[in-house]
Amino acid sequence: MRVVLQKVNHAAVSIDDEVVGKIGLGYFLLVGFAPDDTEEKLNYLVHKITNLRVFEDENGKMNKGLRDVNGAILSVSQFTLYADTKHGNRPGFSQAASPEIAEPLYDLFNQKLAATGIPVETGHFGAMMKIDLENDGPTTIIYER
C-alpha cells in the first residue's frame, strides 16, 4: 500500500466539471494498493496518517496534527503509484492491485479514516478526476507499507 500525503490549505476533486469532494485545511491523499495488501496495513497507515503532526505550533515547529487544526482529509484512489518505469517509455501497472481487490480496500481505508472522527471526503474509485489544490509548505510525505 502506498499513500502520498500532501499538506494543503484546500483541495477539491471534480468529475466531469462537478466537484465531488472538497476540503479546507488538511491532507490530500493519493492512495494505491498492491495485490497483497491487507487490513493490517490499512490500520497501520490510518494510525500514522491521523496522528501525523506537520502543522505549525505557536513556535513555528511542526507539532500539530489534523485534530489540533480542525483539518480534514481528501482521499483519491491512484493505481499509478505502482507504475513500473524500468523498461521502455510507457509505464506498466502489473504491480498494482486489480480493481476487484483495490476498490474494497480503498473503501475500507476511507471508512477507517472517518471512524477516527476526522472529516473525510473522497473521489470516485476508477473515475477520471481533476484535482485542484493549494499545497502548504510544500509538505509531502510518502508512506509505504
Curated annotation (Swiss-Prot):
Q: Which reaction does it catalyse?
A: glycyl-tRNA(Ala) + H2O = tRNA(Ala) + glycine + H(+); a D-aminoacyl-tRNA + H2O = a tRNA + a D-alpha-amino acid + H(+)
Q: Recorded E.C. number(s)? A: 3.1.1.96
GO molecular function term, any single one: tRNA binding
What is one Gene Ontology biological process annotated in the Swiss-Prot or TrEMBL record? D-amino acid catabolic process
Gene Ontology cellular component list: cytoplasm
Question: So what family is this one in?
Answer: Belongs to the DTD family.
Supply the domain comment.
Answer: A Gly-cisPro motif from one monomer fits into the active site of the other monomer to allow specific chiral rejection of L-amino acids.
Q: What is this protein called?
A: D-aminoacyl-tRNA deacylase
Lineage of the species this protein comes from: Bacteria, Bacillati, Bacillota, Bacilli, Lactobacillales
The encoding gene? dtd
